[in-house]
């Protein structure tokens, strides 16, 4: 069987961490790409990961490069490149800076890997996913944004912490835009089948929801310089694994909506089934009136950022 190939654009903390996780699990060979002025950094990080292979016992190949030709025939390309989020900076502030990065990177991806799936991480990720989709000309199932897996992981971890129970027993989903208007689906959240509202009071639940919405900003403030990368990289790994192994996982992803949930021509976080096709299908849940109203607010917020894109 031909070994799979994953290319990661951007060798910052998230990109390098993702490369390490993918290699460690022998999911695919990895090509880590960065700008020419970062050639030493990207090659050094790739070499460092390779030198850990005897310890972990993996045979995946990890290559650091500044040449997009090395990404040729990738099965999946992950975009992490872009301006980082800084303290006090909203994701929306990044839209003008990162749209051009998405355009330039996408043209290289299409040139060398015309049949790949693209996963976008660059913030503001809902708008950047839309930008990449338009720039690529790919069918909508092959361009996917990452936010929901990460936001859901944060939501679940905060619940497990509050209840002092195993993270393995927490079930829940977070939909909507990747920002302050995201929508944790509290009504369907449960702990091994027990509804969350039977275990926590309304005030406790609201505190967890608010902390989830501010999860990225909390880490940015604590770090002082930079943003989260362990959890984001882990979230992308889960998506990559679902696609490469054709697992048909139901995971929240950013997808282009064409009438689902009442929205069109917008990329938004919704429940999706991920398979070797990319997005196999979008799952439409029966939301409560309050959840649907919150999702509308979130979609409006994403649309506002999308309107700032120069190429819609």
Swiss-Prot record:
The protein's superkingdom reads Bacteria
Is Oxidoreductase there in the keyword field?
yes
Going by the UniProt record, its keywords in alphabetical order are: NAD, Oxidoreductase, Tricarboxylic acid cycle
Q: Where is the active site?
A: 178
Give one Pfam hit by family name: Ldh_1_N
User: E.C. number, please?
Assistant: 1.1.1.37
**Enzyme class label:** oxidoreductase
* InterPro entries on file: L-lactate/malate_DH, Lactate/malate_DH_C, Lactate/malate_DH_N, Lactate_DH/Glyco_Ohase_4_C, Malate_DH_type3, NAD(P)-bd_dom_sf
Positions contributing to substrate binding: 85, 91, 123, 154
Reaction equation(s) it catalyzes: (S)-malate + NAD(+) = oxaloacetate + NADH + H(+)
The processes (GO biological process) annotated in the record are:
lactate metabolic process; tricarboxylic acid cycle
Q: Does this UniProt record's set of keywords contain Transferase?
A: no
In Gene Ontology terms, what is one molecular function of this protein? L-malate dehydrogenase (NAD+) activity
Q: Which SUPFAM superfamilies match?
A: LDH C-terminal domain-like, NAD(P)-binding Rossmann-fold domains
The record lists NAD(+) as bound by 10-15, 34, 98, 121-123
Which NCBIfam families does the record match to this protein?
MalateDH_bact (TIGR01763), PRK06223.1 (NF004863)
Q: Which HAMAP family match?
A: Malate_dehydrog_3
Q: Which family does it belong to?
A: Belongs to the LDH/MDH superfamily. MDH type 3 family.
Q: What does this protein do?
A: Catalyzes the reversible oxidation of malate to oxaloacetate.
State the name under which the record lists this protein.
Malate dehydrogenase
Q: What is the lineage of its organism?
A: Bacteria, Bacillati, Bacillota, Bacilli, Bacillales
From the UniProt record, report the name of the gene that encodes this protein: mdh
């Amino acid at each position: 069987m031909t070994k799979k190939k994953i290319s990661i654009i951007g060798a910052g903390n998230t990109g390098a961490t993702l490369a390490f996780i993918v290699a460690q699990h022998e999911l695919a060979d990895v090509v880590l790409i960065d700008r020419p002025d970062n050639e030493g950094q990207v090659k050094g990080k790739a070499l460092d990961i390779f030198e850990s292979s005897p310890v972990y016992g993996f045979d995946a190949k990890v290559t650091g490069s500044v040449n997009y030709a090395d990404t040729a025939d990738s099965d999946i390309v992950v975009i992490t490149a872009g301006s980082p989020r800084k303290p006090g900076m909203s994701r929306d502030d990044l839209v003008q800076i990162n749209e051009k990065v998405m355009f330039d990177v996408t043209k290289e991806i299409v040139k060398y890997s015309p049949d790949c799936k693209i996963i976008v991480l660059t913030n503001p990720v809902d708008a950047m996913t839309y930008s990449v989709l338009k720039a690529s000309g790919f069918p909508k199932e092959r361009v996917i944004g990452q936010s929901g897996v990460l936001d859901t992981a944060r939501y679940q971890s905060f619940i497990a912490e509050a209840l002092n129970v195993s993270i393995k027993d927490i079930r829940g989903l977070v939909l909507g835009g990747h920002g302050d208007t995201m929508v944790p689906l509290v009504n369907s959240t449960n702990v091994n089948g027990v509804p969350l509202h039977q275990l926590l009071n309304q005030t406790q639940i609201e505190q967890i929801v608010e902390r989830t919405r501010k999860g990225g900003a909390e880490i940015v403030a604590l770090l002082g310089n930079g943003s989260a990368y362990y959890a984001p990289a882990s979230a992308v790994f889960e998506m990559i694994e679902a696609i490469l192994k054709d697992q048909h996982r139901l995971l929240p992803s950013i997808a282009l909506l064409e009438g689902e949930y009442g929205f069109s021509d917008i990329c938004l976080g919704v429940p999706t089934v991920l398979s070797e096709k990319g997005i196999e299908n979008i799952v439409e849940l029966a939301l409560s009136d309050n959840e649907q109203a919150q999702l509308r607010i979130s979609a409006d917020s994403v649309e506002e950022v999308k309107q700032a894109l120069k190429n819609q």
